[in-house]
Every structure is written in C-alpha cells, then in structure tokens.
Amino acid sequence: MTDPDSSGFRRTVELSSGQRVTLRSVEPGDRDAVADGYRQLSTSAAFERFHTLKPELARATLDFLTEVDHRDHEAIGAVDPAFSRGVGIARYIRSEAEPTRAEVAVVVLDDWQGLGLGRRLLEAVRDRARDEDVTCLTAEVMSDNERMLGLLRAMGPVSLDRSGSETTAHLPI
C-alpha cells in the first residue's frame, strides 16, 4: 500500500517507538500492495489473521479486501511514510442479519508488531464503525492468539465465547 491521495479517512499517529505512520482508507488501487503485504507475513501471522494458509491471496479475495464501500465494509491501512509501504490493515464488515454489529479484523506486519500499531488501527476502525451506527464489534480469534485477545481486552469491556480452537470476542462500542 503506497500513500497516494485517497478519499476518506486519513490520520497520522505516533507509535510507542516514536515512529509516525499514516492511517488511511484502503482503496481499490491498493490491491497489489495488499497482495505484497500478505506475502511479507510470517506463516503464524497469516494463519492467526486468515485462519488458513495460502501461498497467495486469490484475485477475488484481493478484490474483496480492497473494494470497500466505507459504510458496511471499511478498511483502514497503515502506511510507513519513510518507505511508502503498507504495514498493517484493520477492517470491519457489517452483519447483514444484525446491522448494528460488525466483524473486525486486524493484521500487522511482523516487524511492526509490539509498537501499538494494532491498537491504533483498531481504534480507527472502531471510530469509523461507530460513525456508521455500529454498536458492537465482534472478532473471530484463534484461542491461543493472546496478543489479539489482549488487544481486544485493552479496548474496553469485552465478552469472550470460546469454542475449541476459536474464540469469539464481543466488544461494545
């Protein structure tokens, strides 16, 4: 994901390391950058986010991940301005059955983890969801993904429903 002038959401944030990144709306032109970012993920990071392993994301998946309407499906990407490359993405997808609920997901490149970027991305996508009348975010998380579960707990009161290897988190916003 490069840093072109895209429409919609844009914010610069500082991470715990002092590094600054630009958070902005994901657009269809980010397709190649999202594919490249997926290839840069470690096996464990890719599995924790997608719950499966694939060598490449399919064209239809890339289209789905980048062609968002910014209302029922929002995606916010983090861009490292020093290198104009994407380093993380958070998104929500509104539930058709329960329009005030949306599923949320976050992925951060391995070398950017532990700097507070996941939290900044989750805060941004939470704020966008709230702007669109979503009142609860849900997340399907691998039960042993303590980093993501900890991030969700840090965002506020969260209820967790564990079922085997997956946990569903419910975060009122």
What residue spans do the PLM features occupy?
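Long, contiguous binding/interaction regions
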Residues: 1-173
